[in-house]
UniProtKB/Swiss-Prot annotation:
PANTHER family, sorted: LYSINE--TRNA LIGASE, CHLOROPLASTIC_MITOCHONDRIAL, LYSYL-TRNA SYNTHETASE
Cofactor(s) the record lists: Mg(2+)
Catalytic activity line of the entry: tRNA(Lys) + L-lysine + ATP = L-lysyl-tRNA(Lys) + AMP + diphosphate
Enzyme Commission identifier(s): 6.1.1.6
Alphabetized NCBIfam families for the sequence: lysS_bact, PRK00484.1
BP-aspect Gene Ontology terms: lysyl-tRNA aminoacylation
Keyword Magnesium included in the entry's annotation: yes
Gene this protein is translated from: lysS
Gene Ontology molecular-function annotations: ATP binding; catalytic activity, acting on a protein; lysine-tRNA ligase activity; magnesium ion binding; transferase activity; tRNA binding
Residues involved in Mg(2+) 1 binding: 411, 418
Group of enzyme by EC: ligase
Name the UniProt record assigns to this protein: Lysine--tRNA ligase
Length: 502
């Protein structure tokens, strides 16, 4: 242990010495009136990609590029370097005959991580690499701290998330992940815009946290002197817009839930919710599978993705199964034959399932859901719609046609994980008020995730909402599948982290 601490101290001292040397170089530049932070703009003519893609027409042409110096192999009177911009790498070649002795000396003093603008002629080396023969250059920003050489040598496993800016510089695969994230969201917008949906923005701060069973973040509005909540879902505001006559609406934005953090959950996450008048949950199933297949084709060129060594195919149609049939398939218990809450409670004891409230307070529906979560959901690897959830846990959903113990609700599962949730939306204001009152009773029993009463939403339903289908998708989880990312932190640029002690 003492030897390890000594080695760590030596590494830290060497690192600090490198910083001191870089700061001294910066001071020297200031004394020469070459302060890089006095550079306000770089007039670059091309990116690295444009030069490589158009080499045949640009060969011998003067260009100006800009980016970060990531390697330097300059010895004696000439040498090569690598400059990285948003699109990738371009090789640079510098020679004393072209820039002069003083400029070459200055160039040699630059450090890995410095930001440069470089002018020169496009050419191809004997090995066939498209490069720039430097005729002029300028330091556009000085890197005062060295970049880590390789992430696997770092002691803090969370440093990639805490210093995402460094992670993006070092790791091309990380940059690719977030470029795909952007492409996924763009493709979803294209799909919905092409079907005449209207993108809207609804409040993030609200006096009522509604639309989902979740624990909200609470804040206080000083001027109004009221507690307010960060939204946990966009549902109730979007339904108000359906009432207002916007027949197809969607929103992509942040939701916030004051709950645990793990590989699938971040307190701040991105969701897409949409609502369509005169449709039901069957329409939402069809829309979901078609939209996600479209996104896969657009971003990856195929509906098949490899996730954690498993091939997943997003191609429609997805599998469909009711929750009752899923439980019957994997546990041999048929809840269609269970006639009372007491009988269901006996099954819960026999199966030793974990429930979210006291057994005596659980209904048949609560126990059905507990059985599904315990024994079934992890079984659905290929995209599957699990349909017809109990009415007890679906307060915003219409009852199932022909069986009022269940609702017209489905959740989509991929690789054993829930990725979406959809309903035939409840539009009866009298029933909705009764459902909210039941949720209030659940809250009084200690369920701090139960829904709050929302009188204005009831008022909107009383004005009249047409039959409506609604869908919510956790975009971070979809992006995890399309980028083969194990943790949700790998697809969120700046995930929620406990403050560093350093």
């Amino acid at each position: 242990m003492a030897k390890e601490e000594k080695n760590l101290h030596v590494l830290e001292e060497n690192f600090n010495q490198l910083i001191r040397e870089r700061i001294q170089k910066f001071k020297n530049l200031q004394e020469q009136n070459k302060d890089p932070f006095e550079v306000y703009k770089v007039e670059r003519t091309h990116t690295s990609k444009e030069i490589k893609d158009n080499y045949e027409t640009l060969d011998g042409t003067d260009v100006t590029v800009a980016g970060r110096l990531m390697s330097k192999r300059v010895h004696g009177k000439a040498g090569f370097s690598d400059l990285y911009d948003r699109y990738g790498k371009i090789q640079l070649y510098i020679k004393i005959n072209d820039v002069g002795e003083e400029k070459l000396k200055e160039y040699k003093s630059y450090d890995i991580g410095d930001i440069l603008s470089v002018s020169g002629k496009v050419f191809k080396t004997r090995t066939g690499e498209v490069s720039i023969h430097i005729t002029d250059f300028q330091l556009a920003a000085k890197s005062l701290k060295p970049l880590p050489e390789k992430w696997h040598g770092l002691k803090d496993p969370d440093l990639r998330y805490r210093q995402r800016y460094v992670d993006l510089i070092i790791n091309q695969d990380v940059r690719d992940t977030f470029l795909k994230r952007t492409a996924v969201i763009r493709a979803i917008r294209e799909f919905l815009d092409g079907r005449d949906y209207i993108e809207v923005e609804t409040p993030i701060l609200s006096s009522i946290a509604g639309g989902a069973a979740a624990k909200p973040f609470i804040t206080h509005h000083n001027a109004l002197d009221i507690d307010m909540y960060l939204r946990i879902a966009t549902e109730l505001y979007l339904k108000r817009l359906i009432v207002g006559g916007f027949e197809k609406v969607y929103e992509i934005g942040k939701n916030f839930r004051n709950e645990g953090i793990d590989v699938r959950h971040n307190p701040e996450f991105t969701a897409m919710e949409l609502y369509e008048a005169f449709s039901d949950y069957n329409d939402m199933m069809e829309l979901t599978e078609n939209m996600l297949a479209y996104v896969c084709e657009k971003v990856l060129g195929t509906t098949k993705v490899i996730y954690q060594d498993t091939e997943i195919d997003f191609k429609p149609p997805w599998n469909r199964i009711t929750m009752v049939d899923a439980v019957k398939q994997f546990t041999k218990v048929d809840f269609n034959e269970v006639e009372s809450d007491d009988e269901a409670r006996k099954i819960a004891v026999e199966k030793n399932i974990e429930l979210k409230k006291e057994l005596k307070d659980c209904t048949k529906g609560d126990i059905l859901v507990g059985m599904f979560e315990e024994f079934c959901e992890h079984k659905f690897i290929q995209p599957t719609f699990v349909m017809d959830y109990p009415v007890e846990i679906s307060p915003l959903t219409k009852k199932k046609r022909g069986n009022d113990k269940y609702t017209e609700r489905f959740e989509g599962f991929i690789f054993g994980r829930e990725v979406c949730n959809a309903y035939s939306e409840l539009n009866d204001p009298i029933v909705q008020r009764e459902r909210f009152m039941q949720q209030i009773r659940e809250r009084e029993l200690g369920d701090d995730e139960a829904y709050m009463m929302d009188e204005d939403f009831i008022n909107a339903l009383e004005i009249g909402m047409p039959p409506t289908g609604g869908l919510g998708i956790g975009l971070d989880r979809i992006i995890m599948f399309l980028t083969n990312s194990y943790s949700i932190r790998d697809v969120i640029l700046f995930p929620t982290m406990k403050p560093s002690q350093q």
